Amino acid sequence: MFSASSLLAVIALAISSVSAAGPSAVPLGTAGNYVILASTGVSTVPQSVITGAVGVSPGTAASLTGFSLILSGTGTFSTSSQVTGQLTGADYGTPTPSILTTAIGDMGTAYINAATRSGPDFLEIYTGALGGTTLLPGLYKWTSSVGASADFTISGTSTDTWIFQIDGTLDVATGKQITLVGGAQAKNIIWVVAGAVNIEVGAKFEGTILAKTAVTFKTGSSLNGRILAQTSVALQSATIVEK
């Protein structure tokens, strides 16, 4: 017969042994050192608020627009009143170019890893109309565009994971938001999008965006996560917080 202390120990072990739900994590490599990373450019319409580092390559400092860059004494990075971290481009001093080249390569590898996962748990669910839905942990696949014309929820624990594979565009309507419940964390959510990503005015988004093309966050919109884009990122007085 179990003593009270033994029973509690068994319960604790059972709880600790529960596996996280959802697909295995997508390795970001050194791309994970950036809150925004892009190939051709990053623009802002001031004032945006960005927590983390911003990088562009093979784009140069000239493709970091709207930031009022202040070049460091070493010439290896710049700063901006809109960004808590460093801003870097491919024409900065050594070793910045090689660091960025590696990060861009890691971004491409992460995109392929996420986009080519097979055997989705949810295929074409809600025909891509996410407004009003609740999304549980898992691998999701849409062969067309995805949008949210109303708020929606992502529900799971702090260790659960989500990968959303979208072959078309991703659009979130004005003022709509994602709510995380049950302990779900933005760092465990991956959106891998082949088409353009457009987050409208005042919308609130969660997760890492791995984008094949361009990403736009409009006035008053926000992101808890990262933007890793293989072309450009445009911010219009947006708030981007690294998660």
From Swiss-Prot:
Site (Ice-binding): 198
Function: Binds to the surface of ice crystals. Has low thermal hysteresis (TH) activity, which is the ability to lower the freezing point of an aqueous solution below its melting point. The TH activity of this protein is approximately 0.3 degrees Celsius at 11 mM.
Name this polypeptide is given: Ice-binding protein K3-B1
Taxonomic placement: Eukaryota, Fungi, Dikarya, Basidiomycota, Agaricomycotina
Effect of residue 198 to Y: Has 40% thermal hysteresis (TH) activity of that of the wild-type
Gene label: K3-B1
Keywords associated with the record: Signal
Signal peptide limits: 1-20
Annotated family: Belongs to the ice-binding protein family.
Presence of the UniProt keyword Signal in the record: yes
